[in-house]
Amino acid sequence: MEEVQEYLKKDRSPQQHFLYPLLLQEYIYTLAHDDSLNGSIFYEPIEFIGYDNKFSLVLVKRLIIRMYQQNFLIYLVNDSNQNRFGGHSNYFYSHFFYSQMVSKGFSVIVEIPFSLRLVSSSEEKEIPKSQNLGSIHSIFPFLEDKLSHLNNVSDILIPHPIHFEILVQILQCWIQDVPSLHLLRFFLHKYQNLNKTIQSNKTIYVFSKENKRLFWFLYNSYVSECEFLLVFFHKQSCYLRSTSSGAFLERSHFYGKMEHIIIVCCNNFQKTLWPVKDPLIHYVRYQGKAILASRGTHLLMKKWRYYFVNFWQYYFHFWSQPYRMHINSLLNYSFYFMGYLLGVLINPYAVKNQMLENSFLIDTVINKFDTIIPIIPLIGSLSKAKFCTFSGHPISKPIWADLLDFDIIDRFGRICRNLSHYHSGSSKKQSLYRIKYILRLSGGXXLARKHKSTXVPLLQRLGSGLLEEFFTEEXQVLSFFFPKTTLFTLHGSHRERIWSLDIIRINDLVNN
């Protein structure tokens, strides 16, 4: 990144930066090959049509030499389909392989302007760095603190863009390098044409996994545009509760913008959109799923839905389906978010109050944030990963039968520990114990398949060693948070809720 900053400092005008020459630098492809961004708990890297996606500086240098040839990038995109199913001998010399390398390098390059802007912004504002803020589990303590005091919630599925050109137009506001935008069009149209011509579901799945980094960058840019005005209203409304002189200046500027937005809405939508002034609006998003909660009435949530539909319709030129936005009362509704079923439970309490010689009972109600592990989607994910059947019956993992016993146990144990780590915030962990039981029997069945034996005597022979391997992580976490003098069993601690602040990505099984 330091080399990139030195390159961009050569020209002081930020609008004259040309990013495409960075494709000729070897360190760009080294950054793109960083496998730490694409780790998986399954230890199964994605293979492209049966071949290993190897990295070599020799291949990078050969690619850079070819890129100096005239019209190489055009042939690279147009002819990559013809060489996709070539033989193993010419795979590393094919246009398809070079197309993969260029697209991954390009995904690193387009992130540079945003990364530098983020770093400079944090340095100017002197924002302290905190590793805990990067944890996706930090969302749940926020929901636990807020949802129990709110009335209505709207879970939203953000629509997908109907055309790739919308993604390019969004980036035009941030990237002034026209050749780089044209190259992005080449790659987007290549993937679009492939999805139209190839009919195999497995092949389409592999194509969708070719460049996760570029895909998520484009998708996050698109989503940030979808929620831009919502974030603006929410942030500026918070100033209404402030009393500082600087905030008063912000208020007048905010009122001017609100009037301007109302005029624009009247001209474009032919109907007046209600500017939302309620500061008690809470918005949370992860990937394509968003939650909008408020203490206001059901009518207020309908106004927000009307605002979203019209904004998406006139700004992104597509209709939003009604099923993508559900409005419900929190007390009667549970919604799926990031691998949990979230809701609010009503807990009645009787409080005894004594005044002088008279005593009486007061009935009160306390709303409690509830988190449940959905067992059916998790079993479906295990079935999809070939750990069990659709009904939850454990089966062996034949692809792991050739591994060493230690490696098989380590892989199953890693999956169990990751699931326990991610679902440690559940209020009821019986479903998690069932999932771990399925994985334990699946691991035993895989070992029995390797040794050509049955699972029961093999599990009896391994005994507590295999059990300890599968449950040691949860025991360590619980012993860290609770005193050693506290007596509890593993299954008796199912009511303890622990949010981990070191999780930077959602679990693979949960995300399926």
Swiss-Prot record:
The keyword RNA-binding applies. GO terms for biological process: mRNA processing; RNA splicing; tRNA processing. Keywords: Chloroplast, mRNA processing, Plastid, RNA-binding, tRNA processing. One of its GO terms (cellular component) is chloroplast. Pfam families: Intron_maturas2 (PF01348), MatK_N (PF01824). It is found in: Plastid, Chloroplast. One of its GO terms (molecular function) is RNA binding. The keyword rRNA-binding does not apply. Belongs to the intron maturase 2 family. MatK subfamily. Usually encoded in the trnK tRNA gene intron. Probably assists in splicing its own and other chloroplast group II introns. This is Maturase K. The gene is matK.
